[in-house]
Amino acid sequence: MIVWMGVYDQRSKGKITKSISDLPGIHSSYMDLKEGTLVVMGDVDPVELVRNLRKKWGKAKLTLYVPYDALKEAKIAEAKQKREEIEREALYRYNREIRDIFNDKEEQGCVIC
């Protein structure tokens, strides 16, 4: 979910993240200072979150709410990890140079006895 806070400085960002850190169900949060928004991921009640932020900060508006699905997030993270692993393996692969070795000392040419 995305909550508009109207916060554009580091000091206020610290206060807001500290105030929401005690709420149960928050898996991760990110504060975008350019847009002044707070992005929260987890199984937290949006009404409870906005009420808590308004009580402590004064202004908060819920702009986007998408229900959090932990299984879906886990699948996305697993797919990303597999993709990164494949890319890492591709970096370590290289084309081996095939060399033909000739030994002139033991020629099997025409021998007349």
Swiss-Prot record:
The keyword Ribonucleoprotein does not apply. Residues 111-113 form a propeptide. The modification Cysteine methyl ester is found at residue 110. GO terms for molecular function: metal ion binding. Disulfide bonds: none annotated. The keyword Cell membrane does not apply. Residues 69-89 form a coiled coil. It comes from the Eukaryota. Expressed in embryo sacs. PROSITE patterns: HMA_2. Keywords: Coiled coil, Lipoprotein, Metal-binding, Methylation, Prenylation. Residues 1-65 form the HMA domain. Belongs to the HIPP family. Probable heavy-metal-binding protein. This is Heavy metal-associated isoprenylated plant protein 15. The gene is HIPP15.
